[in-house]
Amino acid sequence: MPAMVLLLCLALGPALRSARCESTEEYDYDYLSINKTWVLTPKAQETDATQILNSLLKNYDNKLRPDIGIKPTFIDVDIYVNSIGPVSVIQMEYTIDIFFAQTWYDRRLRFNSTLKALTLNTNMVSRIWIPDTFFRNSKRADSHWITTPNQLLRIWNDGKVLYTLRLTIEAECLLQLQNFPMDTHSCPLVFSSYGYPREEIVYRWRRYSIEVSDQRTWRLYQFDFTGLRNTSEVLRTGAGEYMVMTVSFDLSRRMGYFAIQTYIPCILTVVLSWVSFWIKRDSTPARTSLGITTVLTMTTLSTISRKHLPRVSYITAMDLFVSVCFIFVFAALMEYATLNYLVGNKKPLEHSSRKARLPPAGAQVMPSFTAINININNIMHWPPEIEEDEDDDPGSPCLEGKECERFFCCIEDCQTGMWREGRVRIHISRLDSYSRVFFPTAFLLFNIVYWIAYLYL
């Protein structure tokens, strides 16, 4: 049996080796044929591209624009907005990341070849003429260089040139903050030629609209992006007329942050100051400490609200609201000071009035015992004792002094006639009751007018 297996292997061995050799040779042949096809074609194209570039740049002068002295060079521009933000209110600037593309025709770069276009690296940028475009309102600008310079140069066989690059620009945006924080802004990005006037370079928008990336990746934080506009205009200067291109980005502020940080605390502080109207007027420490605390709180809120703004000379919507809230809080404190002052002065005046109405000392000695009793009774029971809580009684003795005569009429002789005409009777002890109605009503009316004016007008 082993002998038969050995004979079978010897008989089939040459056939297996022959088949393996044939398959190996076929595999090598296919690989070589594919490899030759893959290598030879790019090699021919590379040689052709090198010859084209050498011939184009042989007598090319990159210091001269295309068609110089014949006609102006038309530059078609396009912008792709990669991201916008953040926006700095204090510095009045915003950051934008864009892909900036410029297209023009240069007859000196025409070539005849089977190649439709040549896509070149950044080394060729410095060897041909490119527009001297600059951004007029940029404070700082950076071109991206990682991992290689983010620039593209493409030349078509008809002389068309495309030059794109990625830029991050910190541009100036003059914010008008009168309606802060319900404000809207239009932040421009302005560019033009630095040295060529309109007679030599004319900028045109390649498309009517500008593309933007997904806005969810933008870092606008306090703002919402509402739209953009692209325009062109002619700027007249002493050096000539220049084509100026502008892209305006419309932004509206989100006021949720400021509502939580400023508006709601101010409203609650004003409401808290009204609590003193329900505290007894003889609780001087409680009412005074509450009034001073609310005034200091409003001072702190006013300082914090200005922290997010530049030092502008005009009043903003938030400044107006905080100032009015401060006035309400301060008025609540002054209300108790006025009440305490008037009530404190009323008691000495009443005491002096009672003394003035007492009969002279000699009049008390009367020959009749009954008369003495009458006089004593008069002394004991007239004028009647008036409790402090009954100061608002219309029949209470009249206050003497300028306060009484100026602000209300309480003298019996002037209840009718010229003294009463045009006067309003005000009860001092009811000043807290008046304030409980007046302060909330006035503050509510102010809020209605304020929010309608700034949100809808």
From Swiss-Prot:
Which Gene3D superfamilies does this entry report, sorted A to Z? Neurotransmitter-gated ion-channel ligand-binding domain (2.70.170.10), Neurotransmitter-gated ion-channel transmembrane domain (1.20.58.390)
Q: Which cysteines are joined by disulfide bonds?
A: 173-187
Q: Does the keyword Lipid biosynthesis apply?
A: no
Q: Enumerate the Pfam families for this protein.
A: Neur_chan_LBD (PF02931), Neur_chan_memb (PF02932)
Q: Which UniProt keywords apply?
A: Cell membrane, Chloride, Chloride channel, Disulfide bond, Glycoprotein, Ion channel, Ion transport, Membrane, Postsynaptic cell membrane, Signal, Synapse, Transmembrane, Transmembrane helix, Transport
> Which domain of life does the protein's organism represent?
Eukaryota
| Location of the protein in the cell | Postsynaptic cell membrane; Cell membrane
Task: Provide Extracellular-side residue ranges.
Answer: 22-256
Instruction: Give the signal sequence positions.
Output: 1-21
Keyword 4Fe-4S: yes or no? no
Which ranges make up the Cytoplasmic topological domains here? 340-433
Tissue expression per record: Abundant in several brain regions, including the ectostriatum, nucleus rotundus and hyperstriatum ventrale.
GO biological process terms held by the UniProt record: chloride transmembrane transport; gamma-aminobutyric acid signaling pathway; inhibitory synapse assembly; negative regulation of chloride transport; synaptic transmission, GABAergic
What are the GO cellular component annotations? chloride channel complex; dendrite membrane; GABA-A receptor complex; postsynapse; postsynaptic membrane
* Residues linked to a glycan: 35, 112, 230
What are the TM regions of this chain, as residue ranges? 257-279, 283-305, 317-339, 434-457
For membrane topology, the record states: Multi-pass membrane protein
Q: How does it assemble?
A: Generally pentameric. There are five types of GABA(A) receptor chains: alpha, beta, gamma, delta, and rho.
Q: Which family does it belong to?
A: Belongs to the ligand-gated ion channel (TC 1.A.9) family. Gamma-aminobutyric acid receptor (TC 1.A.9.5) subfamily. GABRG4 sub-subfamily.
Q: What is this protein called in UniProt?
A: Gamma-aminobutyric acid receptor subunit gamma-4
Q: Which organism is it from?
A: Gallus gallus
Q: Which gene encodes it?
A: GABRG4
